Amino acid sequence: METYVLSDRRLASVEAWQEAIDLAGLPLRMSQATPFSELQGALPVVLERRPTAFECDHCDAKELMAELSEVAFDRPWTFALAFRWGADVYAGASAYAAAAAYALATDGVILDCEEAKLISPERAIEISRELAQSEALIHEAVRRVMELYQNKSQP
């Protein structure tokens, strides 16, 4: 899965990005091992004390917008930052939270490829929280099923 932030300016560093995350009140800590300008591939993060990672890459905004002609972009953008993740729900939640903070800090917009439309940073934060919560619900459901199974197998 993937999402993008389109903006007309870039943050100077991962540290500045972390400040934007903190300002938004999001429970996300980003690795600062790779300079922002060199981000390409897996970016280790911790969401609510849980380590995970998502891919983060700089993209050509003009090329991206040309490829996605079905999306109603409100105007041309200068920069694009890609966020990609697989089946790890916390990676997805982290990517949405990081994208939201980045968009807020750069006055950018978020392209949600799942919905094939632009979404607000506030909506990205909602999606992040929904994903993180769904993981907890899944674990609770599995725990209950295991408990029922164990109780039925005992004499």
Predicted segment positions?
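Acidic (Asp/Glu-rich) sequence patches and key acidic residues
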Residues: M1-P155
